[in-house]
């Protein structure tokens, strides 16, 4: 994203593919990633995932980075400590997703100023919860940006089941954006 002065904001999005801690959270279905779970994750495997993710962060070198498929704030903090390129600030909310999968945003406070954040609750047509859409309003070089970090319901369980869920999520996001644009037709929005 470039300003009129030519200065750019480096923005990215990354699916970190199930960045989970090793503890079994009894309130979610995360046990396959816990120690002793079906995925056979060990401390060494977890540490290697953090190391590899930190290397990707270095390659991306983003000022603002949306992430999906993170379990909680703890793993984001661990990732931030494994990466020594920047001291990112973390925006994360625990969502009601049954598997404990959340969205998050990392940002460099030296470059991007956060004004407001909120999770947008995403209730599916059959009433079941899924991960929230993360909304972040921030400022860069005098420009107000509206960022929506989202990871729509997966095709896990088949496309026939997934399509109505994904459509509902698309409608929710479209309504949020329409409301933002009705208040400010020139709003700068990133998805």
Where are these regions (language model features)?
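N-terminal, active-site-proximal structural segment of metallo-dependent hydrolase catalytic domains
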Residues: 2-101, 170-175
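Beta-sheet entry/capping signal
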Residues: 8-10, 63-64, 144-146, 188-190
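Metal-dependent active-site segment of extracytoplasmic phospho-/sulfohydrolases and closely related
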Residues: 181-191
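Intrinsic structural disorder
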Residues: 1, 15, 161-165
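Metal-dependent phosphoester/phosphodiester hydrolase catalytic core
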Residues: 25, 140-183
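Structured beta-strand-rich core segments of catalytic domains in phosphoester-bond hydrolases
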Residues: 64, 70-144, 148, 152-153
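Short coil-to-helix leader/linker segments, especially the first N-terminal amphipathic alpha-helix
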Residues: 1-2, 129
């Amino acid at each position: 994203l470039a300003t009129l002065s030519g200065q750019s904001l480096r923005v990215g999005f990354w699916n970190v593919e199930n960045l989970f801690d090793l503890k079994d959270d009894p309130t979610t279905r995360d046990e396959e990633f816990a120690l002793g779970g079906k995925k056979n994750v060990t401390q060494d495997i977890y540490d290697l995932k953090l190391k590899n993710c930190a290397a990707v962060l270095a390659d991306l070198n983003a000022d603002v980075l949306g992430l999906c498929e993170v379990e909680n704030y703890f793993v984001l903090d661990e990732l931030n400590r494994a990466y020594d390129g920047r001291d990112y600030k973390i925006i994360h909310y625990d969502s009601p997703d049954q598997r404990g999968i959340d969205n998050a945003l990392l940002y460099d406070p030296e470059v991007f100023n956060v004004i407001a954040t909120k999770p947008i609750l995403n209730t599916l047509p059959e009433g079941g919860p899924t991960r929230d859409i993360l909304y972040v309003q921030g400022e860069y070089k005098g420009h107000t940006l509206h960022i929506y970090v989202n990871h729509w319901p997966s095709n896990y369980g088949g496309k026939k089941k997934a399509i109505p869920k994904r459509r509902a999520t698309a409608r929710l996001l479209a309504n949020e954006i329409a409301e933002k644009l009705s208040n400010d037709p020139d709003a700068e929005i990133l998805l």
